[in-house]
Regions:
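Conserved helicase motor
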Residues: 110, 132-142, 157-163
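Acidic/polar loop patches that form or flank catalytic/metal-binding clefts of enzymes
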Residues: 127-134, 184
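Hydrophobic positions in the central parallel beta-sheet of the AAA+
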Residues: 105, 154-156, 176
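A long, glycine-enriched binding/interface module in the latter
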Residues: 112, 121, 145-151, 159, ...
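ATP-dependent helicase/translocase motor core
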Residues: 1-102, 111, 115-127, 149-153, ...
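Signature of the SF2 helicase/ATPase Hel1-core->accessory helical subdomain module
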Residues: 162-207
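Conserved motor-coupling elements within RecA-like helicase/translocase cores
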Residues: 135-154, 167-171
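Short, flexible loop/turn elements at secondary-structure junctions
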Residues: 48, 77-78, 157-162, 180-182
Length: 207
């Protein structure tokens, strides 16, 4: 019957020794105590587990092949993408392969940036790095990346990056995680708007 099928799936899936240890090690999220007096713990959903794991594998592959393409994950609204990014960030920071990487969390709206910044800044112990900073200007972004040799997690918006921006860093272990990345790659057609001051032409970010 169905209840027993679900129980069997959980026992064979979650409680397989190697997988259970993997979940226990990387997929139980908790905020720093000063930000969460109740010390609530959040355990991953199965899509978050497999997404974060496969993304890490894909990022490793992209470094080996020097493709610069770490992968794409599509998650519906409310599926917990911010926690998936948190699980992934923790695994990347702990990975010996990446040798203490620097991670950029990029969004396309300030409200998303504020939301992620609050969550990530309050999770330094879980992430495993004391430098978790929200970037509010291009100059600060440049200073932080050019002056850093390892580690650090930075939250910023896609608007901070422009074609005339100088080389920020040539390190191979800087990893970008972009939330809602598709929105900067669509609606590329020119939009014309007539205003009191004249004609305005706008394009999608990727134009």
């Amino acid at each position: 019957t169905l209840p027993f099928d679900e129980l069997e799936t959980m026992i064979k899936g979650v409680y397989a020794p190697a997988r259970f240890l993997e979940i226990f090690r990387d997929y139980i999220y908790f905020q720093d105590r000063e930000y969460d007096s109740d010390e609530k713990e959040i355990v991953c959903r199965y899509p978050q587990f497999f997404a974060a794991r496969l993304l890490k594998q894909s990022i490793v592959k992209s470094v080996i092949e020097k493709s610069g393409k770490g992968g794409t994950y599509f998650g519906a609204t409310g599926c917990g993408k911010s926690y998936t990014m948190m699980f992934l960030t923790r695994m990347l920071m702990k990975s010996k392969f990446f040798r203490s990487p620097t991670i950029l969390i990029i969004t396309d709206r300030t409200d998303l940036d504020d939301q992620l910044s609050k969550q990530f800044v309050g999770s330094k112990r879980y992430i495993g790095d004391e430098t978790v900073v929200s970037i509010d200007s291009r100059e600060k972004l440049r200073q932080e990346l050019q002056g850093r040799t390892s580690g650090g997690v930075y939250m910023t918006t896609i608007q901070k990056f422009t074609e005339d921006l100088q080389m920020l860093t040539d390190r191979s272990n800087v990893i970008c995680i972009s939330d809602e990345a598709h929105r900067s790659q669509i609606n590329l057609d020119q939009k014309v708007k007539i205003t009191d001051t004249g004609v305005e032409r706008t394009y999608g970010f990727a134009k």
